Amino acid sequence: VTQEPQLLEKRNTYENIAFALEVMGTPNDEIESKTNTLLDLVELNENAFKYPDQLSGGEQTRVSIARSLANNPLVLLCDEPTGNLDPELSIQIVSLLEKINRAGTTVVMATHDSSIVNRRKKRVIELANGKIARDESEGSYILR
């Protein structure tokens, strides 16, 4: 999941999610079932047939998350998924990622937003100059 959702412009929300399953050769009935389940998870059922340019930034991020989950990854990598979102939408996206984590998927998120780190009290690994500068099981963000 990237800071700028890389959605397929000529495909609607449903098709953007289903695409990840199509390229893996998933049977059509399974594509339909899984895509609908993912639309439920990210709360985009009402936007299933909207195109990326008809979605807000937060909605686009949720499509990107759903598409990333389509093939049941063990780990979900998120690079600044809230970077271009307002604080309220950021909270919604982080809450969705926490829900995904509680369901069993490891979520690794890079962020510069100290409020996200401090509010969640999750494991924090700080990188400086390409090396681990800190690794705390329930750390908080410290400005240095």
Language-model regions, residue ranges each:
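Short coil-to-helix segment of the ABC ATPase nucleotide-binding domain corresponding to the Q-loop/switch region
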Residues: 11-18
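ABC nucleotide-binding domain "signature" region
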Residues: 30-42
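Conserved ABC ATPase signature
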Residues: 51-55, 59
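Hydrophobic anchor residue at the start of the ABC signature
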Residues: 65
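A short, proline-enriched helix->beta-strand linker immediately N-terminal to the Walker B motif
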Residues: 70-74
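Catalytic Walker B motif of ABC-type/P-loop ATPase nucleotide-binding domains
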Residues: 76-79
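Helix N-cap at the start of a conserved alpha-helix in ABC-type nucleotide-binding domains
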Residues: 87-89
